[in-house]
């Protein structure tokens, strides 16, 4: 069963909002033969321009489902989040079930979800089955700090850059966020 931890930033989470989130995101349970014991972390944030940002993260045993959406209408944003999460589950379900079938194991996910859902998303599933790596690249990581890595990323015109952090000697990644700012991912051992 999926439990919910719902937090609001600049917004009070009313029973109506809580119920709507639990009802919509809770529908993901239908994709599992054995519903995992999971916690859905939901953060709802409102901004001064009345835009709402909804983030949902559901860590499972082998995968973390995560979706984020900004919308003027909170409820429409929740619907869009649910659609994104369903696409992620279907994509993952297809891969996992294929792998387990090849090994002769029982499917982890429900083989068929309502026929209407399957028909509506047949194109999505077909394109998700064909993962094709079209280019492979090898390079050595240079030691630098995160500011230097951002400069290198911008010089190359990329959206991310992998480097060896000079201070920690670990592999790190800087990336450009949707809001134009930068993020840093640091690896741990």
From Swiss-Prot:
One Gene Ontology term of the molecular function aspect: ribosomal small subunit binding
Transmembrane parts of this sequence: none
Q: What is its main location?
A: cytoplasm
- Example GO biological process term? negative regulation of translational elongation
Record Pfam families: Ribosom_S30AE_C (PF16321), Ribosomal_S30AE (PF02482)
- Which keywords does UniProt give here? Cytoplasm, Translation regulation
The entry's localization annotation reads: Cytoplasm
Tell me the CDD domains matching this sequence: RaiA (cd00552)
**InterPro entries attached here?**
HPF/YfiA_ribosome-assoc, HPF_long/plastid, RHF-like, RHF/RaiA, Ribosom_S30AE_C, Ribosom_S30AE_C_sf
Q: Does the keyword Signal apply?
A: no
GO cellular component, as recorded: cytosolic small ribosomal subunit
Q: How does it assemble?
A: Interacts with 100S ribosomes.
Q: Which family does it belong to?
A: Belongs to the HPF/YfiA ribosome-associated protein family. Long HPF subfamily.
Summarizing the function annotation, the protein's role is: Required for dimerization of active 70S ribosomes into 100S ribosomes in stationary phase; 100S ribosomes are translationally inactive and sometimes present during exponential growth.
- In its UniProt entry, what is this protein called? Ribosome hibernation promotion factor
Organism, by scientific name, is Staphylococcus epidermidis (strain ATCC 35984 / DSM 28319 / BCRC 17069 / CCUG 31568 / BM 3577 / RP62A)
**The organism's lineage?**
Bacteria, Bacillati, Bacillota, Bacilli, Bacillales
